[in-house]
Amino acid sequence: MRIADYSVTKSILDRYGFTFKKSFGQNFLTDTNILQKIVDTAEIDKSVNVIEIGPGIGALTEFLAERAAEVMAFEIDERLVPILADTLRDFDNVQVVNQDILKADLQTQLKQFSNPDLPIKVVANLPYYITTPILMHLIESKIPFQEFVVMMQREVADRISAEPNTKAYGSLSIAVQYYMTAKIAFVVPRTVFVPAPNVDSAILKMTRRDQPLIEVQDEDFFFRVSRVGFVHRRKTLWNNLVSHFGKAEDTKARLEQGLALAGIKPSIRGEALSIQDFGRLADALKQVGF
């Protein structure tokens, strides 16, 4: 029997009198086949360490611990710590850290692995309400995570992996794909969770690029320009740029100059621009004094 078997999950929750906290976005997976697929998708073996976020009662952790060198699981809900100590008692390669991943000093924390030089993969069932902040925090942390295999709301997975000229494409697609490749591995129905969420989930596999997808003069400015391009999706790029940078004649003249330098039509919409287009635009705008 596995922790994720429905009868086992229910028995654990009943034994500890555990009640779900909506503020933590808690939905526990009760399908062992899906858990096996997650670990297979992540290609976990004894040559990698794993960071897990939100282990819950340890359903995914159990599968990870069987395959990985070590697992470090970050759990924000202190009520789950004694439950995890119980459900994972047979594993000596799991550390549970009772901390918000967004506040953790990851550089220091990762030194707690027995062999901190092993590649690190992130495997997690992320809370829907905080998926994007967690992902961007980890991606921008400068820690060389090799890969992310994470469950999230289907809509967010679609946005992250989207291509230009699609409804889902936006600044989040650009922010992630600049650093990583992103592909939906499979979809997870809402019916396999306790309690069942209101939407379906997807497993997104993201692999870090050796180098960012493009080279830009100023990364922060590049991300800023890409966000500006999507502020009002139905507006033209020109209207979004003017709304953001200002309507002064000198400003508009420099915007025109930057667009011309980048070879981009002012009448285009942000969703039609590739990451490379946004990179050229950001560099051109820097060149004309922004």
Swiss-Prot record:
Entry superkingdom: Bacteria
E.C. code: 2.1.1.182
Magnesium as UniProt keyword: no
UniProt keyword annotation of Cytoplasm present: yes
SMART domains per record: rADc
Family to which this protein belongs: Belongs to the class I-like SAM-binding methyltransferase superfamily. rRNA adenine N(6)-methyltransferase family. RsmA subfamily.
Gene3D superfamilies named among the record's database cross-references: Ribosomal RNA adenine dimethylase-like, domain 2, Vaccinia Virus protein VP39
Catalytic activity: adenosine(1518)/adenosine(1519) in 16S rRNA + 4 S-adenosyl-L-methionine = N(6)-dimethyladenosine(1518)/N(6)-dimethyladenosine(1519) in 16S rRNA + 4 S-adenosyl-L-homocysteine + 4 H(+)
UniProt xrefs under InterPro entries: KsgA/Erm (IPR001737), rRNA_Ade_diMease-like_C (IPR023165), rRNA_Ade_Mease_Trfase_CS (IPR020596), rRNA_Ade_methylase_Trfase_N (IPR020598), rRNA_adenine_dimethylase (IPR011530), SAM-dependent_MTases_sf (IPR029063)
Record's keyword terms, sorted: Cytoplasm, Methyltransferase, RNA-binding, rRNA processing, S-adenosyl-L-methionine, Transferase
Annotated GO CC locations: cytosol
CDD domains assigned: AdoMet_MTases
Function as written in the Swiss-Prot or TrEMBL entry: Specifically dimethylates two adjacent adenosines (A1518 and A1519) in the loop of a conserved hairpin near the 3'-end of 16S rRNA in the 30S particle. May play a critical role in biogenesis of 30S subunits.
Protein name, UniProt field: Ribosomal RNA small subunit methyltransferase A
Main location as per UniProt: cytoplasm
Subcellular location: Cytoplasm
UniProt-annotated binding residues for S-adenosyl-L-methionine: 27, 29, 54, 75, 100, 125
Single Gene Ontology MF annotation: RNA binding
